[in-house]
A protein has these predicted regions:
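Metabolite-binding pocket within alpha/beta catalytic cores that recognizes anionic/polar moieties
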Residues: 2-160
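Generic non-transmembrane alpha-helical segments
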Residues: 17, 21, 167, 171-182
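Non-catalytic positions within long, well-ordered alpha-helices that form the structural scaffold/packing
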Residues: 104-108, 206, 225
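Short acidic/polar active-site loop segments enriched in Thr and Asp
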Residues: 110-111, 211, 230
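Active-site/ligand-binding-proximal alpha/beta "capping" segment
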Residues: 174-211
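Zn-dependent metallopeptidase/amidohydrolase metal-coordination segment
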Residues: 215-237
Length: 237
């Protein structure tokens, strides 16, 4: 990424490239986490752009992350989907790892759905459970909003009193009840990785209020909320 350019210029440059390739932009985006890229099979794809072709985009180095920005219809909804995300442990700065979320906002996305595979710590959870993220604990050593703040993007000191939309959580619970889907809810702990947690760390994270732990999601949510986007998060345990 060309760091000598102004951050706003980088965002605008990338958004302009995507707009030229795609045309009409959706209002909803999904970030597909580890092992969740199979959802793409249910998208009627109109345009798919490899990350390697998008100016200023990082390229995912993680196995299981294909690295494509997809535009198409999921059911009746026109969406943008990131098939593969960028992690702090890969060596990117927080600004680089969350750059796609900045671009989404520039393109007009208002609602962001984030997903991940997480380690469950709540004894009531079973492997394969779906957990709505209702809050998070940020244990990353770097913050995505550290450094110069651009008022055009959001405030210097954004509120995080509702990182995950209460409205969307309520809607998800209603749908799960209608379809008899087992749905859990809890707090996601975000850590740097790439090592998995020690038994002592698991006990610590549980004691401070965590229900699941993973190496992503939190930075993207912080950046999305900084820009006023509505966010819904889901972990696969």
């Amino acid at each position: 990424m060309e760091q000598e350019k102004n951050w706003l210029e980088l965002i605008s440059e990338t958004a302009a490239y995507i707009t030229e390739k795609v045309g009409e932009m959706p209002k909803t985006a999904i970030i597909l986490g580890t092992g969740l890229g199979e959802l793409v099979k249910h998208i009627d794809i109109k345009v798919a752009i490899p990350y390697s072709e998008i100016p200023n985009f990082p390229v995912s180095t993680v196995e299981g992350h294909s690295g494509r920005l997809i535009f198409g219809n999921l059911g009746s909804k026109y969406i943008m989907a990131m098939q593969g995300r960028f992690h702090f442990y890969e060596g990117y700065s927080m600004k680089e790892a969350t750059f796609p979320v900045r671009v989404m906002n520039k393109l007009g996305v208002k609602t962001l759905f984030v997903s991940n595979a997480a380690g469950g710590m709540n004894p009531e959870f079973r492997i394969g459970d779906l957990m709505i993220i209702n809050d998070h604990i940020n244990l990353f050593p770097e913050h995505p909003l550290r450094g110069k703040n651009y008022n055009e993007l959001g405030p210097r000191f954004p509120s995080m009193d509702e990182p995950y939309s209460h409205r969307l959580i309520k809607k998800a619970k209603e749908i799960a009840a209608e379809k008899n889907i087992r749905l859990m809810e809890g707090v996601y702990v975000g850590t740097q990785g790439p090592t998995f947690e020690t038994p002592a760390e698991y006990r610590y994270f549980s004691r401070i209020g965590g229900d699941a732990v993973g190496m992503s999601t939190v930075p993207e949510v912080i950046v999305a909320r900084h820009m006023g986007m509505e966010v819904f998060g889901m972990s696969v345990i």
